[in-house]
Amino acid sequence: MTTLNLPHLRPHQLKLALLQPQIAPNTGNIARACVASGTELHLVRPLGFVLNDKNLRRSAMDYWPRLRLTVHDDSNGFFDFLRRDGARCWLFSSKGEGSLWQTRFTDGDWLIFGSETAGIAESVLAAHPGRVVRIPLAAGERCLNLAAAAAIALFEALRQILSDTMSPSRKGDL
């Protein structure tokens, strides 16, 4: 078996947010992906679990202590924070008109996901025209698990952001 000498991810400013996540193991898996990719995680209350939930910690494994985590009290405060910061946001929803494959991410973007049960509120989606993205699925299929969707979007954004920093011979290896 050949071992590839692939590059490590370089530091970046991408951020991922979960609006009112309900299922601790999903959030734990997303936290693990965030640590592994060097991405900040923001959780927006209310949460469907407590942060010391054993299922959350089990799914995040020993990655949790290294997680760069911010918890926001509510959606209104979170979106006010983003507006003040001038953040560029991408909201992921099965109702998105834009496709992940056509979205062009830049360093510093925010990837925002709704809860497992309700997704992102219609009013929030309507307030971000042109910024609502869906992950392409097979015909007739509704949606992906939140942790799977977040990982797909996160690593596609990183591929785009970081691939331009690699040597030409290694660009396809991210």
Give the role of each language-model region.
Residues 1-174:
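Post-transcriptional modification and biogenesis factors for structured RNAs
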